[in-house]
Amino acid sequence: MAIAKKCVRFLLNFNYRHPVTTGTLRRYSAGAGDTSQFDVAVIGGGIVGSASARELILKHPHLKVALVEKENRFAFHQSGNNSGVIHAGIYYKPGSLKAKLCVKGLNLSYKYFDQKGIKYSKCGKLIVATERSEVPRLFDLYERGLKNGVKDIQLMDSKEMKEIEPHCKGLQALWSPHTGIVSWAQVTDSYVKDFIECGGKTYLNFEVKKFIEAESAEYPVKIIDTENNVINAKYVLTCCGLHSDKVAVLTGCPEEPKIIPFRGEYLYLVPNKSKLTKTNIYPVPDPRFPFLGVHLTPRIDGRVIVGPNAILAFCKEGYRWGDYNMQELKEIIGFSGFRKMAMKYASFGIKEMIRSAITPLQVMQVRKYIQEITSADVERGPAGVRAQAMAKDGTLIEDFVFDSKPGHGAIGSRVLHCRNAPSPGATSSLAIAEMVVEKIEKEFKI
C-alpha cells in the first residue's frame, strides 16, 4: 500500500510533456470562417451520434442537422475498435435501458443490415461453465435472458455444446443463436451515408473547444472548434464517448458521471487455428468484477480474436502502453471515485496488467474451454478503449445514461447529453436513436 501511495504522488507531481502526435488532420472540412446555422448539431460521429443524426433527419426532414466529428473519419474510436459482436441482451438487468434497447436494437440491426446489404454472420454465442461453481450463475443468466425477452436461448449439456463447437469443453453452456458479428465501423459509415442522402451536413476535423451563447435569438448556441471555426445551432446533442464528461462541462453541465478509460487488448489466433471456433465463446462472468472476461470471437474478416483484458488507459485515447497524457492521468487519479474503485479492484487490476505483459497468461484463460490453443497460436492484435462512466463513490455506472440540465444556463438548457453508452451501445444504436429523438422532440419541442 505504501508503494502504491508513492506511485500516485509521483504521477500527480510528474510534469513530463506528452509528445506531440504528427500527421493528424485538424482542418475544418467546410472551410475557415464558415458560420453555418442548424436546428440541431450532433457532436460526435461514433455509431450512436451517427444513428441519432440519421434518425432525426429521417423523422424530421425539414430540419437542418449537422453531424460533427473531431477526427478525420467517423467511427474512429470506440465504434471502430471493438469486437464486432451483435449482442442478444442476456447480461443486462431486467428493466434497464440496456436490456430494453439491446433486444430491440438487435432486431432493428438485422433488418437494417439486410436492407443495406451489409455483411454479417448470425454465428451465435456459447457462454460456457467450466467449473461447478459457475453453473448456478449460468442458470441465473438464462433466467435473466428470458426476462429480457431474448429469443431462443437454451441451456445445454457438454454433449449438446460439442455439437455446436466440437473443440469446446465445459460442464454446461448457454446457447444464444441470434448473437452475431458485423463490422460496426461499416455500419456507422452506412448511417452517415443515409444522413447525407437525406440532406444532413457532416463536419470532420472539427474538434469542439467551447460553446458560447450567441447574440442570435434564433441560433443561440455558438460551437467553436480549436481553429476558431464556428457552427451556430438552436439545439445540441452530444454523443462524445470517451470525451462525454469534458464536453458536458463545456456546455455548463456537471462533469459527472466521470469517464474513466479502460483499454481492452486483443490477441489474434493465427490463421491456421481459426477453424477451432466458428461461434462466440464466452466465460460465465464473475459477479465480483465489472467485465465479461476473456472470450473468443470470430470476426467478419475471417480472423478470430481472443480477449479483451481490461486495464487502465493512461489517457482518453490510450490504445498502447506508450500512450499517455499527464494532465488526463492526473485527473483520473485525482478523482475520488477512481481511487475508491482502484482499492476495491486492486487485485483484479494488477492481474490484468500482468496478463497484458505476459501473453501466455491471457492464453490460459481461453484454454479453459479450448485446450488446443497454445501461446504459439496467438499474436498481438488490435486494442480498443472503453469509456467507463463512474460515480463519486467509485460505482461503475452500467446502464446507459442520457440527460439534459435545464437549470444550467442558456446553453445547458439547449443540450441533451448521451453520457454513457458502452457495450451494447453499437447493437442498441438504432433503438437508442429512436429514444434520443423522442427526448429531443419532448424537451426541445421540435
Can you describe what each PLM-predicted range is?
Residues G33-V48, A66:
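Beta1/beta-strand and adjacent pyrophosphate-binding region of the FAD-binding site
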Residues A51, F211-M326:
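Flavin-dependent oxidoreductases
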Residues I57-G80:
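Glycine-rich FAD pyrophosphate-binding loop
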Residues A75-G105, Q115-Y120, E160, A313-K351:
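Glycine-rich active-site loop/strand segments that organize a redox cofactor
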Residues G84-I164, G170, G293-V294, C315:
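Dinucleotide-binding Rossmann-like beta1-alpha1 core, especially the glycine-rich loop
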Residues K93-K104, V128-R137, W175-I196, Y203, ...:
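Short beta-strand to alpha-helix junction loop
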Residues L174-Y235, C239-K246, L430-E441:
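Helical element adjacent to the flavin cofactor pocket in flavoenzyme catalytic cores
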Residues S336, M341-I446:
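C-terminal catalytic lobe of FAD-dependent flavoproteins
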